[in-house]
Amino acid sequence: VKVTITAPELCPRYIAHYVKDIKIGPSPLWLKRRLALCGLRSISNVVDITNFVLLEMGQPMHAFDLDTIEGREIVVRRAFDGEKIVTLDDKEFTLNRENLVICDGSKPAALAGIMGGLNTEIKDGTKEVLFEAAKFARDSVRRTSRSLGQHSDSSAIFEKGTNEYTTERAMKRALHLIEQLGCGTVTDVCADVATEYSDTKVKTMTVSPEKIDALLGIEVPVEDMEDILKRLNFGVKRSGNELELTLPRYRDDIFAYPDIAEEIIREYGYELSLIHI
């Protein structure tokens, strides 16, 4: 399986994993129930796995019938002006260069981050599946979704932003469920493409507890700050009068002092800060 990304600014990361010996059938009762409780109907074991991972981990996934992928090649690119695609809900769209598409060797197979194409859907006779987990630029998904009037659970999540750590974990979770449900054989064939826009570096920050206290308007013991941040999976090391922090890989929402202060006060207790106001 070959993956090529020609629009790296719109797709920083793309993971594709090949699963063979697929046995399409109904999902077990526990999976049907969990989907139903979230307002989703059960479709088939393979499709249900992708929907379950979306709900459980907040990472949209997609499954392609590999026999419909020409040349067993995935190309992530901008659509050509006038290019057409029919999505899984049987709607036809005319595309332009503002739209990002997942293609095989010759044609679009999915609207990136929004919905798969009808020509590559999972059917009862599907024997080979290519699972997709990716990170798409939120602005790109938003523009395409709004310009085409095509919205989905996946587009709603991508528009808010996803992170690559969750992308990796979601793929592993989906493959684990394939094995757990016994509906396919997970192979070692995997393409994991990280572009120059990929961001997998460990993020660090150095903060002053004194400045945190000034922001909060109360004095939080340094030991409590350390304990709270460690419980939130931050790496914490005391260096003189400062704390050196290593941010969890899945926390893309932490940028500055106010973000750290918010994490601390939420755990320490807003009611305690009110006493001092």
Could you tell me what each predicted segment is?
Residues V1-L274:
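RNA/tRNA-interacting regions in translation and RNA-turnover enzymes
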